[in-house]
UniProtKB/Swiss-Prot annotation:
<dbReference type="GO" id="GO:0019301">
    <property type="term" value="P:rhamnose catabolic process"/>
</dbReference>
<comment type="similarity">
    <text>Belongs to the zinc-containing alcohol dehydrogenase family.</text>
</comment>
<protein>
    <recommendedName>
        <fullName>2-dehydro-3-deoxy-L-rhamnonate dehydrogenase (NAD(+))</fullName>
        <ecNumber>1.1.1.401</ecNumber>
    </recommendedName>
</protein>
<feature type="binding site">
    <location>
        <position position="169"/>
    </location>
    <ligand>
        <name>NAD(+)</name>
    </ligand>
</feature>
<comment type="function">
    <text>Catalyzes the NAD(+)-dependent dehydrogenation of 2-dehydro-3-deoxy-L-rhamnonate to 2,4-didehydro-3-deoxy-L-rhamnonate. Also has weak dehydrogenase activity on butane-2,3-diol. Does not show any detectable activity in the presence of NADP(+).</text>
</comment>
<feature type="binding site">
    <location>
        <begin position="251"/>
        <end position="253"/>
    </location>
    <ligand>
        <name>NAD(+)</name>
    </ligand>
</feature>
<feature type="binding site">
    <location>
        <position position="92"/>
    </location>
    <ligand>
        <name>Zn(2+) 2</name>
    </ligand>
</feature>
<keyword id="KW-0479">Metal-binding</keyword>
<feature type="binding site">
    <location>
        <position position="37"/>
    </location>
    <ligand>
        <name>Zn(2+) 1</name>
    </ligand>
</feature>
<dbReference type="GO" id="GO:0016491">
    <property type="term" value="F:oxidoreductase activity"/>
</dbReference>
<keyword id="KW-0862">Zinc</keyword>
<feature type="binding site">
    <location>
        <position position="89"/>
    </location>
    <ligand>
        <name>Zn(2+) 2</name>
    </ligand>
</feature>
<keyword id="KW-0119">Carbohydrate metabolism</keyword>
<dbReference type="InterPro" id="IPR002328">
    <property type="entry name" value="ADH_Zn_CS"/>
</dbReference>
<dbReference type="InterPro" id="IPR011032">
    <property type="entry name" value="GroES-like_sf"/>
</dbReference>
<dbReference type="InterPro" id="IPR036291">
    <property type="entry name" value="NAD(P)-bd_dom_sf"/>
</dbReference>
<comment type="pathway">
    <text>Carbohydrate degradation; L-rhamnose degradation.</text>
</comment>
Length: 331
């Protein structure tokens, strides 16, 4: 089968590999659509310690069931599904609490298993969910990440919020903030095209940097800041923009080390929460939102769909500042 394989830093290659066969309880999907995630761009640049080349990445995907392993009864050949890419033990305290994203031995399809940048991918059958559209189905996973981040932010009606980063997770976060009752939703991104696109998702203010949103009279202006980038600078900015008692949720994964003012956190009673992946319930909510066919903006100028063969060029474009918030590869 054909694969898009990360072979070295800043190198994606179209290669061939044997088609995998599902074990008991697993299924093989003929990949229909797979999104390029910001964490994969970080890996591509050599900034993500979880990913090591050579690797077939791809954890945001949909596909058609092509083969089922022994004992699988919940899906059948021909079904169009998406899949939760988290593979966990099911026995540790976190799994037993319904918090599989914290599993002590968690693994992820596209990192620890070959991912969906290939014609075929293997997934656990009990983590598959029916979707109505192949392209939309590849957007469930990033939406589940946004669902968790906004849930951790504990938005109240009338809250003010800012989202740093107008990639797809940032944009989905904007939409969810609006649905949660936030009245002022600002978006920060250096890309002018992405800022314009954020209005389609419900942004009320846009700026190329956080300083442009803050005033001398109100240097700390927001109840909540969601950092969907993950740089040291954006993490520090997220704290500097909060009112006293404000909440910062970090969902972006990029730089490992960040120097913070601990006294500021104490004196202003700030909350800082990390947000990683999602619970099963949050993933299921994302499936429901996508299948409602009402969540995503009708105007899709934020999305571009390309062939797998265009994958190497797409990675280069995205790291150099693409106007598209999401590129999905198809077969």
């Amino acid at each position: 089968m054909k694969t898009l394989t990360w072979t070295a830093k800043e190198t994606m290659s179209i290669l061939s590999a044997p088609a995998p066969v599902p074990e008991p309880g697993w299924i093989a999907l003929r990949v229909a659509g797979v999104g390029i995630c910001g964490s994969e761009l970080s890996g591509y640049l050599g900034h993500n310690e979880l990913r090591k080349p050579p690797l077939v990445m791809g954890h945001e995907f949909s596909g058609v069931v092509e083969e089922v392993g022994h004992g699988v009864t919940n899906v059948k050949i021909g079904d169009l599904v998406t899949a939760n890419p988290l593979v966990t033990c099911g026995r540790c305290i976190h799994c037993l609490r319904g918090e599989r994203q914290r599993c002590e031995s968690r693994r992820i399809i596209g990192i620890d298993f070959p991912g969906a940048y290939a014609e075929r991918v293997l997934v656990p059958s009990n983590q598959c969910y029916a979707v109505k559209d192949a392209i939309d189905g590849a957007l469930v996973e990033p939406l589940a990440c946004a669902v968790r981040a906004v849930g951790l932010a504990r938005i109240k009606v009338g809250d003010t919020a800012v989202v740093i980063g107008a990639g797809i997770i940032g944009l989905m976060t904007v939409r969810l903030l609006g649905l949660s009752g936030a009245k002022r939703i600002a978006v920060v991104d250096p890309n002018d095209e992405r800022l314009k696109i954020s209005q389609l998702w419900g942004a009320t203010e846009m700026a190329p940097n956080l300083g442009a949103l803050l005033t001398d009279n109100h240097p700390q202006s927001f109840d909540c800041v969601i950092d969907a980038v993950g740089l040291s600078t954006t993490r520090r900015d997220s704290l500097n923009a909060l009112i006293r008692g404000g909440r910062a949720v970090w969902i972006g994964l990029h730089e490992a080390l960040t120097h913070l003012d601990g006294n500021q956190i104490v004196r202003d009673e700030l909350e800082v929460r990390g947000s990683f992946c999602y619970t099963d319930d949050e993933f299921i909510r994302a499936v429901s939102l996508i299948n409602s066919q009402k969540f995503l903006p009708v105007d899709r100028q934020w999305l571009d769909v390309r062939s797998l063969e265009e994958g190497p060029a797409a990675f280069k474009e995205l790291v150099n500042g693409s106007p598209f918030s999401k590129i999905i590869l198809t077969f």
